[in-house]
A protein has these predicted regions:
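Short Pro/Gly-enriched beta-strand edge/turn motifs at strand-loop
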Residues: 1-8, 116-122, 142-144
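Short, glycine/charged-enriched secondary-structure capping and boundary segments
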Residues: 45-47, 74-78, 98-101, 166, ...
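Divalent metal-coordination and catalytic microenvironments
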Residues: 9, 23, 33, 43, ...
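Metallo-beta-lactamase
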Residues: 29, 36-38, 122-132, 138-141, ...
Length: 235
């Protein structure tokens, strides 16, 4: 696991599968996503390595219902006064009240999807609570005016979070960064057309720092990279 300060107040937590991010406000910490089941101790250690205490965590925002994003949420939500937030359309899946929909895979995605699913641990997700359900345009209460951006397609209730004052985007799995460094629309989507439209919507934002659920964060040229990728997606 790596813990890297991307810009002041923002740390990147590289987990064994997927990523989490830690944002610091004067009144406490916000965690974006929580990794696979069993990730809570790793994230607690990451918070310490970032110079803070797990007890300072005030909210956990979940970008969508997949296990590599909500797996640690049940444990983390018990650390103290931690509010758990997610989009209303994914909330039933996160709470475990309904099974989440499977992706509509393109033929070229199937080998990668099968490989990824074989590598995931068998430990089941303990469904966490969701304290607050969000919709597009809601303010989750961190980052000097962060805004929830609905990006349906990867899942019905996928969310990104945009911090206008800091020009930081937490894209979840609505976007990704490939091994070659290129920004791309996320894969394994329940609605491929919807995912492409949501990705293009993100490209309209003024982005200085882009944080992905999979792939390295982008701290230079993010806006141009998104615009170029969106043009290819629309073509």
């Amino acid at each position: 696991m790596d813990v890297i300060e991307l810009v002041p107040r923002l740390h990147f937590i590289r987990l064994p599968v997927g990523h989490a991010y830690l944002w610091s406000d004067p009144d406490g910490l916000t965690l974006i996503d929580s990794g696979l089941p069993g990730s809570a101790p790793l994230i607690a250690d990451a918070i310490l390595r970032a110079g803070s205490e797990p007890a300072e965590l005030r909210r956990l925002v979940l970008t969508h219902f997949h296990a590599d994003h909500i797996g640690g949420a049940s444990d983390i939500s018990g650390w103290g006064e931690v509010e758990v937030l997610a989009h209303h359309a994914d909330a039933p899946f996160i709470r475990g009240r309904a099974p989440g929909p499977a992706p509509d895979l393109a033929d070229w995605e199937r080998p990668s999807y099968d490989q990824v699913t074989r590598q995931l641990p068998a430990e089941p997700v303990v469904p966490p609570r969701v304290d607050r359900e969000l919709a597009d345009g809601d303010e989750p209460g961190f980052g000097d005016g962060a805004v929830a951006v609905a990006v349906p397609g990867h899942t019905p209730g996928s969310l990104a979070f945009y911090l206008p004052r800091h020009r930081i985007l937490f894209a979840g799995d609505a976007a990704a960064r490939g091994p070659d460094g290129r920004v791309m629309c996320g894969v394994f989507n329940v609605d491929r057309a919807g995912a492409a439209a949501s990705f293009c919507r993100l490209a309209d934002l003024d982005i200085a720092v882009a944080c992905f659920g999979h792939g390295e964060p982008l701290t230079e040229g993010a806006a141009a990279a998104f615009r170029a990728a969106a043009e290819e997606t629309r073509a």
